[in-house]
């Protein structure tokens, strides 16, 4: 049986501000924006990802800014960082963690933190026998 992670809730204080950040600055695709009384569900997906995030009202009780270090795996960390910086996102410099792993970090307006991650081809894989 396949089990697929497809939706990760992100707690935010201001849905419109967060929606604009993820759509316009980070470049996520807006999949849905549904309102039903007190419930609001905004689903956004990173380009090329099978997993989406959801922000809104009435969907999560976790305090805004409490999600830490969600990873966006990218094929070219320098290009990904440059794209975010060009869009106005404050991103750390790329850090070489050794073993072929590089990362850069940014926060959304509520303080939820994200990591751009690149692992060089073959890094961390056990030797073939």
Give the location of each predicted region.
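Eukaryotic phosphotyrosine signaling hubs
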Residues: 5-7, 65-70
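Core segments of cupin and vicinal oxygen chelate
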Residues: 2-3, 9-51, 86
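Vicinal oxygen chelate
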Residues: 1, 7, 31-34, 40, ...
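Short amphipathic alpha-helices within nucleic acid-binding modules
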Residues: 21, 78-83
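Helix N-cap motif at beta-to-alpha junctions
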Residues: 14-15, 75-78
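Short, charged/polar, Gly/Pro-enriched secondary-structure boundary elements
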Residues: 49-53, 111-114
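Short, charged/polar surface micro-motifs in flexible loops or helix N-caps
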Residues: 47-52, 60-62, 77-79
């Amino acid at each position: 049986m396949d089990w697929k992670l497809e939706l990760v809730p992100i707690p935010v204080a201001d849905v419109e501000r967060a929606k604009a950040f993820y759509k316009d600055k980070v470049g996520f695709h807006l999949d849905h924006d549904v309102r039903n009384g007190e419930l609001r569900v905004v689903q956004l997906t990173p380009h090329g990802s099978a997993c989406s995030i959801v922000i809104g009202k009435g969907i999560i009780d976790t305090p805004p800014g409490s999600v830490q270090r969600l990873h966006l795996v990218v094929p070219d960390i320098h290009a990904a960082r440059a794209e975010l910086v060009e869009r106005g996102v404050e991103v750390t410099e790329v850090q070489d963690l050794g073993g072929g792993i590089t990362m850069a970090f940014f926060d959304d307006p509520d303080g939820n933190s994200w990591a751009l991650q690149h692992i060089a081809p073959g890094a961390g894989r056990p030797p073939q026998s």
